[in-house]
Curated annotation (Swiss-Prot):
Membrane topology label: Multi-pass membrane protein
Signal sequence residues: none
Record-given protein name: G protein-activated inward rectifier potassium channel 4
Lineage, highest ranks first: Eukaryota, Metazoa, Chordata, Craniata, Vertebrata
Residue numbers covered by motif Selectivity filter: 149-154
Function: Inward rectifier potassium channels are characterized by a greater tendency to allow potassium to flow into the cell rather than out of it. Their voltage dependence is regulated by the concentration of extracellular potassium; as external potassium is raised, the voltage range of the channel opening shifts to more positive voltages. The inward rectification is mainly due to the blockage of outward current by internal magnesium. This receptor plays a crucial role in regulating the heartbeat. Can be blocked by external barium. This potassium channel is controlled by G proteins.
Protein source organism: Bos taurus
Membrane topology, Extracellular segments: 112-135, 155-163
Chain intervals with Acidic residues compositional bias: 396-407
Keywords of this entry: Ion channel, Ion transport, Membrane, Phosphoprotein, Potassium, Potassium transport, Transmembrane, Transmembrane helix, Transport, Voltage-gated channel
Amino acid sequence: MAGDSRNAMNQDMEIGVTPRDPKKIPKQARDYIPIATDRTRLLSEGKKPRQRYMEKSGKCNVHHGNVQETYRYLSDLFTTLVDLKWRFNLLVFTMVYTITWLFFGFIWWLIAYIRGDLDHVGDREWIPCVENLSGFVSAFLFSIETETTIGYGFRVITEKCPEGIVLLLVQAILGSIVNAFMVGCMFVKISQPKKRAETLMFSNNAVISLRDEKLCLMFRVGDLRNSHIVEASIRAKLIKSRQTKEGEFIPLNQTDINVGFDTGDDRLFLVSPLIICHEINEKSPFWEMSRAQLTQEEFEVVVILEGMVEATGMTCQARSSYMDTEVLWGHRFTPVLTLEKGFYEVDYNTFHDTYETNTPSCCAKELAEMKREGRLLQYHPSPPLPGGCVGAELGAEAEQEGEEEPEGLSGSQETKDSA
């Protein structure tokens, strides 16, 4: 039956439309490599280095290639200019003004040439369109004086030149438009809140440990400035490739990670460093992930912090990510907040520090099942238990054996107490 279904599937694939360029298909889809989605793979000897989807600085490692419709960038020219690097932006700024001055300077020279003003230079009986305009250089200087409105001096337009008056109006209007566009572009680029994100910190590592008897994925965020981020909110996404039951390979699939959206804990009052907590429950993508399986999984957790800059009111966004190798199982963050005389002090020297804590090595699903069956003890600060959740089971069994005392022994003890 399996062979017949496989042959039928191959026939369907041959009949179907094949892609034009098979090189564009991901390698996993071309080779039909099955991807384990039930997290039952054995431990591998080591992981191969992988490319980050997002750098720790927040830069996305995605390159847009083979873009055919490049005209779309020109349809939103303002955003295109703002997104340019500073050296190209300054080059465009200089070229736009220079070309505008040269163009209108050529028009002023052309009017003088057609009217014959260049042939009557120095003739006091001749009334030119622009006085003291003797060539292209003087026409170029007159164009700069007109567009920048610095005031006429040696060169000035006369009343006997209607075409010059019309050109003066056109250049004044177009010059104002160019000024508004280019100065506005430079102002927006200067006032962008990207640099504000440089003072928003994320911990170098994320940790998984117990909090209120539940496994939680946690990371820390902080703000170095005294001016706060207004309406700060945070969200997280799991980036992980997967393969569907139909065999479709989905690279870099994005899954939401709940960091308090339903309870409002994702809205932050970021005055001091905060630990963001994701409770690993039935809806969590880490529900069936144990400590051993964490060492073989390949994923990336992207965290995004958004808010408005208090000084400018502009929206600011800071991003970071945690690879699977940057998630520490059985660790907690070192406290950074201390109470001083009259104020709280934050020690950023220990912002990224963690310490080991007693945490079961089993997945959250097994931990919840053991808790429902009553086989799990309360975890207190102590050396790590061996064998994941096995230590917790042994401790629970020992406690049950201690509670089951013989009736004769308990009765003799009561007799001694009464005596």
